[in-house]
């Protein structure tokens, strides 16, 4: 009986140490990413001129390839991306205020592109290649955002991802980010 109690006590101690270590790591990961939003005003008056450049960047980035489901509306999302962990569904990036990015700010869009975080701070899956887009300049993300706001709004709810446990958790995603992602800042040559 004493052996069983000792074994249970040791197991609980190990679980507590692992949980404590996990919380410390998650705190470090959050701090490591730095400030989540570089806040600066978005000049709505310049939006039409900037949107022209954004249209080019969105085309070069081939955003429609992922954010348009077969037979669906452009940029309305819903396309499934199969991975060995399950299926990730792309989001609606039209200007719809309820289901798209129409209620986002330019800073929210920058946060998604640069830090891989949604408007609400949720970590995004790297099926969205923010690991590469982190190098895009703020001016370029503002231009892309201006263009996407000019796209016809499509009210289409985002499908939930169909990922296996534990890959469907923010904790697993945080661990992946700690190992493989660091936000970067691209500085073009002058």
Where are these regions (language model features)?
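Gly/Gly-Pro-rich "capping" loops immediately C-terminal to redox-active cysteine motifs
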Residues: 70-106, 124-138, 161-172
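C-terminal capping alpha-helices of c-type cytochrome domains
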Residues: 23-29, 105-119, 132-158
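The canonical Cys-X-X-Cys-His
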Residues: 54, 60-70, 109, 144, ...
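N-terminal type II signal-anchor transmembrane helix
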Residues: 2-37
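Conserved N-terminal glycine/acidic-rich loop preference
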Residues: 26-47, 70-85
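Solvent-exposed, acidic/flexible segments
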Residues: 43-51, 56, 86, 102-106, ...
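Alpha-helical membrane-targeting segments
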Residues: 24, 29-33, 159-187
């Amino acid at each position: 009986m004493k052996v069983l109690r000792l074994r249970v006590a040791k197991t609980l101690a190990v679980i507590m140490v692992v949980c404590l270590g996990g919380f410390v790591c998650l705190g470090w990961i959050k701090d490591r990413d730095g400030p989540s939003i570089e806040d600066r005003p978005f000049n709505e008056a310049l939006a039409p001129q900037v949107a022209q450049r954004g249209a080019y960047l969105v085309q070069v980035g081939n955003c429609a390839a992922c954010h348009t489901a077969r037979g669906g509306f452009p940029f309305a999302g819903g396309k499934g991306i199969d991975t060995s962990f399950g299926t990730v569904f792309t989001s609606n990036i039209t200007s719809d205020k309820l289901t798209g990015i129409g209620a986002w700010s330019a800073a929210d869009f920058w946060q998604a592109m640069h830090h891989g975080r949604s408007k609400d701070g949720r970590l995004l899956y790297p099926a969205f290649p923010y690991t590469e887009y982190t190098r895009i300049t703020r001016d370029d993300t503002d231009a892309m955002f201006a263009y996407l706001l000019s796209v016809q709004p499509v009210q289409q709810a985002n499908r939930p991802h169909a990922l296996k446990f534990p890959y469907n958790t923010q904790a697993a995603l945080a661990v992946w980010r700690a190992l493989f992602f660091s936000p970067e800042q691209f500085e073009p040559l002058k």
